[in-house]
Each structure stands twice: as structure tokens, then as C-alpha cells.
């Protein structure tokens, strides 16, 4: 047996590193959300699954954070349920008080309004008032979008993870809004490969895991508290399609991030050239790292107030597109006065507007964030 309790393990534990002779492991009191290589899952074309244990584990003690994991732990439990129920396999998980209890697949949704929304739209997952993460979504529900609006009056989004990170949910859109003046809470969420649209507004979120979000191309993060990192580098779509697609305001790549006081870094896909229809960053007082230099095409660019310590390096625009070929294609640019006062901004305007023939920037006065005002950079 191996005791790794209180060992400072972070988000992922990889069972492939364990020696073959290890049959018991204690992972309690660690912040582990992902349990890689615990089981091998093979999914057939008809959706049938074959699950195999990768290790001969007969004792597994888990931290509270394990409750969010479905892809590995739920399948491990389902595969070994008879052994767990019969007592030949010992699997426990800590509760919110740190007490280890026998593992089960029932999960709470504390907010009554969120529970009502989920029951109305994703009833297949419920067992009474609890979500049973071992249940499958039927064909009618597995592709439904998630859209929790202000009118739904949700203040605690905990429990939504059990749908969004469910391998049987194939929805492409996740939109969560909290009423202005309220602060919705969501400690951790991981989204999957089918998601293309992610909109979060007015939520306090500690950990947003986008490592599997390779289909993501529209992201809006508005009034988000606590979040330090926004990493969309795993997307194989954002900024990587043709100029005709990326220049289309309906389907082009889109990133809007403002009034996120704790956000320190934004990471784009690491590609030589990126194209997008819309990029807006405003009022990010903690921003340290955001590299836009590999963006070569933008339909609209909005830069609001950013910390003076942040080195603002503008995109190197070489591609311009307008579906109306009778109109000279440009990038529409909006900035705040503080942004305009930066040397890099004035150099950007000189390059693409004042010294360009034809001019490649066009002016629009309004910034989106209510805490910013657009500045007339053409005067």
C-alpha cells in the first residue's frame, strides 16, 4: 500500500506512475480532480463502453475533490461495483468535513433554482433530488445546451459540474449568468471536447479547466471573480480556420474578457497565425501575461484599461477581410484613453491608420465594459 495523503498533489494524479505491486493507495487531503489511467475506456460506434482496470487496485481512498470526476472514477466504480458492495474492494471518498465515507455516485445540487433548471432539462440524470453520475443521458437530452439566465435566479452553481463534465453530455454551448448585484459561486468546472461556446457572467470561480475543450471558439468572461488563468491553448479551432469563416461574425472566433479583477494570464493557441472576428480585453487590473502577437486578422479589436505593468504588444495584422468585397476591409479598433496614451497604441495607430494607404483601421467609439469609456483616437 502507498500512503500519499496530504502530499500536496495538485489537479491530476496519473495512476500509470504506480508500480505494478501497489494494490492500495491513500490520496486523501489532496486537491486532485483528475485520475488519469485508472481505467481504460473503449467506446464503440453504437455508444457501448468497455471498461478495464489498468491496475489491480483493491483499496482506494480519495479526497473530497474526487466527487467531480466522472470520466475515470465513475467508470471505475461501475466496473467494480459488485466487489465494492461485497467488501472485497475498499473505495472511500472524503466528505466536506474531511471524513472518509464509502464511495457512491449520488451528488447534491444545493441551489434549489439550479436544481429545478437541471431537473426540467436533464431529468435523465436525477435520482430524487440528487444527480446520479452513473446515469446516461437519453438522446433527447444529451445534446441540449445549458443556458442558466438571470431570470433563473441561481446564486450557487455547484452541482452543474456533474452535467458539464459528464462524458454522456454532448452539448455545444454553456452559458451561465448571475443577477447583477449577486455573486454566483462555482469552485471548479471542467468542460469537454464538444463545447464550442462558453459564456460566464457574474460568477466567482476558482478553477476553470479547458484542457479538453478543443472545439472552443467563442468565449465571454464578464465580471468573473477569483479566476487567475484563462487558457484556451488546447482549442484546435480558435483562430485556426479560413479568413472567410473567422471573418464571419456569426461563427468566427471570439474572445471577450472584462472586469475580471484576479485574472493574471490569458493564453491563446500556440499557432504561427491566428485569425478572429472579435477580441475585447478591458479592466483586468491583475493581468500579467497575454500575448496577441501571433494574431494576423481581427474584425474588431477593443482594448480597455489594463495595468501599466502589463506589456501591451499589439497583433501584427497582415490579413483583412470583409464579406462585402465593395468595401475596403479594415479592423475596427476601440480603446480607452489610458490605452491610447501608451506608446505601443500610438505606434499601432500610426502603422495601420495614420501612415497606411489605404487605412486598415476604422474607428468605433464604444467599449463594452461599463467601467470604461471609449476614446476618439482619430483626432
Regions found by a protein language model. Name each.
Residues 1, 10, 21-22, 57, ...:
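Conserved hydrophobic position(s) of the canonical leucine-rich repeat
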Residues 2-4, 23-27, 60, 144-147, ...:
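Conserved hydrophobic beta-strand positions in leucine-rich repeat
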Residues 5-64, 269-336:
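Ankyrin-repeat and related helical/solenoid repeat scaffolds used for protein-protein interactions
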Residues 7, 30, 65-66, 151-152, ...:
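Conserved "Asn-ladder"/turn position within leucine-rich repeats
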Residues 12-17, 35-40, 71-72, 128-135, ...:
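Short, T/G/N/S-enriched strand-turn elements that build extracellular solenoid repeat scaffolds
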Residues 31, 42-43, 47-49, 53-178, ...:
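N-terminal capping/linker segments that flank leucine-rich repeat
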Residues 43-51, 237-249:
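Intrinsically disordered, low-complexity Ser/Thr- and acidic-rich flexible linkers and loops
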Residues 178-217, 222-223:
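Right-handed parallel beta-helix
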Amino acid at each position: 500500500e502507498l500512503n500519499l495523503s496530504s502530499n500536496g498533489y495538485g489537479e491530476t494524479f496519473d495512476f500509470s506512475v504506480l508500480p505494478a505491486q501497489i494494490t492500495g493507495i491513500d490520496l486523501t487531503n489532496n486537491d486532485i480532480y483528475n485520475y488519469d489511467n485508472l481505467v481504460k475506456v473503449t467506446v464503440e460506434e453504437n455508444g457501448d463502453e468497455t471498461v478495464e482496470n489498468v491496475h489491480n487496485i483493491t483499496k482506494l481512498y480519495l479526497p473530497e475533490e474526487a466527487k467531480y470526476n466522472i470520466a475515470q472514477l465513475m467508470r471505475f466504480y461501475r466496473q467494480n461495483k459488485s466487489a465494492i458492495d461485497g467488501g472485497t474492494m475498499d473505495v472511500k471518498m472524503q466528505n466536506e468535513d474531511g471524513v472518509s465515507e464509502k464511495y457512491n455516485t449520488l451528488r447534491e445540487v444545493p441551489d434549489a433554482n439550479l436544481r429545478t433548471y437541471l431537473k426540467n432539462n436533464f431529468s435523465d440524470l436525477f435520482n430524487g433530488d440528487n444527480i446520479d453520475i452513473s446515469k446516461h443521458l437519453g438522446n433527447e437530452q444529451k445534446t441540449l445546451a445549458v443556458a442558466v439566465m438571470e431570470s433563473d435566479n441561481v446564486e450557487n452553481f455547484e452541482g452543474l459540474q456533474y452535467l458539464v463534465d459528464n462524458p454522456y453530455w454532448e452539448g455545444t454551448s454553456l452559458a451561465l449568468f448571475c443577477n447583477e448585484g449577486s455573486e454566483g459561486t462555482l469552485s471548479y468546472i471542467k468542460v469537454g471536447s464538444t463545447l464550442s461556446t462558453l459564456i460566464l457572467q457574474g460568477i466567482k470561480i476558482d478553477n476553470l479547466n479547458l484542457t479538453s475543450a478543443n472545439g472552443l471558439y467563442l468565449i465571454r468572461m464578464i465580471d468573473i471573480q477569483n479566476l487567475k488563468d484563462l487558457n484556451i491553448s488546447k482549442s484546435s479551432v480558435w483562430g485556426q480556420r479560413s479568413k472567410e469563416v473567422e471573418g464571419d461574425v456569426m461563427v468566427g472566433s471570439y474572445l471577450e474578457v472584462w472586469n475580471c479583477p484576479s485574472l493574471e494570464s490569458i493564453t491563446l493557441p500556440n499557432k504561427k497565425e491566428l485569425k478572429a472576428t472579435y477580441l475585447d480585453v478591458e479592466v483586468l487590473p491583475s493581468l500579467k501575461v497575454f500575448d496577441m502577437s501571433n494574431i494576423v486578422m481581427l474584425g474588431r479589436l477593443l482594448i480597455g484599461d489594463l495595468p501599466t505593468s502589463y506589456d501591451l504588444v499589439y497583433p501584427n495584422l497582415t490579413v483583412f477581410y470583409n464579406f462585402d468585397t465593395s468595401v475596403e476591409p479594415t479592423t475596427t479598433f476601440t480603446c480607452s484613453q489610458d490605452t491610447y496614451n501608451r506608446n505601443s497604441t500610438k505606434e499601432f495607430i500610426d502603422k495601420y491608420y495614420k501612415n497606411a494607404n489605404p487605412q486598415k483601421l476604422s474607428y468605433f467609439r464604444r467599449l463594452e465594459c461599463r467601467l470604461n469609456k471609449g476614446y476618439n483616437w482619430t483626432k
